[in-house]
Regions:
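Membrane-interface "cap" regions at the ends of multi-pass membrane proteins
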Residues: 1-36, 40-46, 59-60, 64, ...
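Helix-loop-helix connectors at the membrane interface of multi-pass transporters/channels
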Residues: 1-5, 80-84, 112-131, 164, ...
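Helix-loop-helix junctions that connect adjacent transmembrane segments
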Residues: 2-10, 49, 124-127, 156-289
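A generic transmembrane alpha-helix motif of multi-pass inner-membrane proteins
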Residues: 358-363, 393-452
Length: 452
């Protein structure tokens, strides 16, 4: 183990690594579940495509805004570092611990449980909880071998996801789909949708787009930070958005929105398998189910890598025990990885998939909105601050992001009051830890860190 004083992360990652982190982190459970859950409620192919397009716009606005902050503070930690430097140590701690516990541990548990559910269709005797536990343990061990090794896994995962989705799109458009016509000729008009229905679907789509900010959490390990983050995040996000729209078009060729329900009236959660079975037959559908398992494990692996860096960053600030900053000889934050793994296993054991999805989506939406607002506050308070990168068309991207964030959060809170309790509960726990321990140990930001 390295002594704590030498625990500086090396910048081993480049532009394509940053893009790979975006692709690998974004493409996961969401694209293979969300459309099936909400298509029938949306009622038309146009509405399905519109909600995914607006989700892409939201992610683009968030990406451009986060790049400005990441260029100011090119260190590991993402939203935690940004909020800490803008709003102060307490706010940064609340955000950091919320992201670490709910955003990353929760997301890892969600992907793990989804992976377990898909795996049970291959091996019915293995429960989703058991398979999720095995997947989390394997991913954690991989990342303990070092940054280069885990980065190789992530880049291979990103390449595999692009090949899989591109293959699905090309093959999907090559067959004669008689179940439904392409979205432009599907009946229905999105202007007839209620705001609450569209907002609820948007919240689910936003979860599918989560991951566009992943490179900001490992910025301390990225070379030529300004160029790599700017192009890596933007290209990765645009590539995923294009793939998402094309994949959903394929889903709509397989079935009209009103057909994406089971005979008992429940939505088709496994929309990937459902669509491929209708387009290509049972054999291909079963094979696609196995490929989805690989996609889900790749996403789980990437999220585990990024999430541990939040604990690492908070440990360096003195807000969590210094043991979390310990790196092994290969440069991996092994203690942070172990703590994260233990937390994920507890979530898998004691929570359900639905509750996790709702809480993760709401809390991360609120956090990202607060972070984006910080860009506007910095422009007002420190207009002369040297900025290596400036948001194009400012203030349009951050304003669009904030408006959509408030609307989505309001829609979720209205439809599911439990999300309010979970959100307030998370904030309460983080504040208790702050006043009970972290406030006394937190080190103030250096003069070069604080910008607000």
């Amino acid at each position: 183990m390295h002594p704590q004083g030498s625990n500086r992360q090396k910048r081993n990652l480049g532009l394509w690594s940053a893009a790979g982190v975006v692709v690998c982190g974004m493409v996961g459970a969401g694209i293979f579940t969300t459309t099936g859950l909400h298509a029938a409620e949306l009622g038309s192919g146009w509405a399905v495509m519109l909600v995914w397009a607006v989700g892409g716009l939201l992610a683009l606005c968030g990406t451009l805004t986060y790049i400005e902050l990441a260029a100011l503070w090119p260190e590991a930690g993402g939203s935690y570092v940004f909020v800490r430097n803008i709003y102060g140590p307490m706010s940064g701690f609340v955000v950091g611990l919320s992201v670490a516990i709910v955003g990353f541990m929760g997301s890892i548990a969600v992907v793990g449980l989804t992976l377990g559910a898909y795996f049970q269709k291959v091996v019915p005797s293995v429960s989703p909880d058991t398979m999720a536990t095995v997947a989390v343990l394997v991913a954690t061990l991989v990342h303990c071998f070092g940054v280069r090794e885990s980065n190789a896994v992530n880049q291979l995962g990103a390449l595999f996801k692009i090949i899989l989705l591109t293959g699905l799109v090309c093959w999907g458009f090559s067959v004669d789909a008689t179940a439904a016509t392409p979205p432009p000729s599907v009946g229905g008009d999105p202007t007839g949708l209620s705001s609450s229905v569209f907002g609820s679907a948007m919240a689910a789509v936003a979860f599918a787009y989560l991951g566009w900010d992943n490179p900001t959490y490992i910025a301390g390990e990225i070379r030529n930070t300004k160029r790599s983050l700017k192009w890596g995040m933007t290209l990765g996000m645009l590539a995923v958005t294009a793939l998402y729209l094309l994949v959903n078009w394929v889903f709509l060729r397989a079935a009209a929105p009103h057909e994406m329900i089971h005979p008992d009236g429940s939505p088709v959660v496994d929309i990937g398998r459902f669509a491929t079975v209708r387009l290509f037959g049972e054999t291909v559908g079963g094979t696609f189910n196995i490929l989805i398992l690989l996609v889900l494990f790749s996403t789980l692996s990437l999220t585990a890598m990024v999430g541990a860096r939040v604990f690492y960053s908070m440990g360096r600030k003195g807000e969590l025990p210094g043991a979390l900053t310990i790196l092994n000889r290969r440069g991996s934050p092994v203690i942070a990885l172990a703590v994260q793994c233990a937390g994920v296993l507890l979530l898998i054991r004691f929570t359900g998939l639905k509750d996790l999805l709702e809480s993760v989506g709401v809390i991360l939406t609120v956090i990202s909105g607060a972070t984006v607002l910080g860009v506007i506050l910095l422009r007002i308070r420190r207009p002369g601050l040297p900025r290596p990168f400036r948001v194009p068309l400012y203030p349009v991207p951050p304003v669009i992001y904030l408006l959509l964030t408030v609307w989505m959060a309001w829609s979720v809170f209205r439809s599911n009051p439990t999300s309010i309790i979970l959100t307030l509960g998370t904030i309460g726990v983080t504040l208790a830890v702050w006043f009970g321990f972290s406030r006394r140990h937190s080190r103030p930001p250096s003069s070069g860190d604080t910008a607000a």
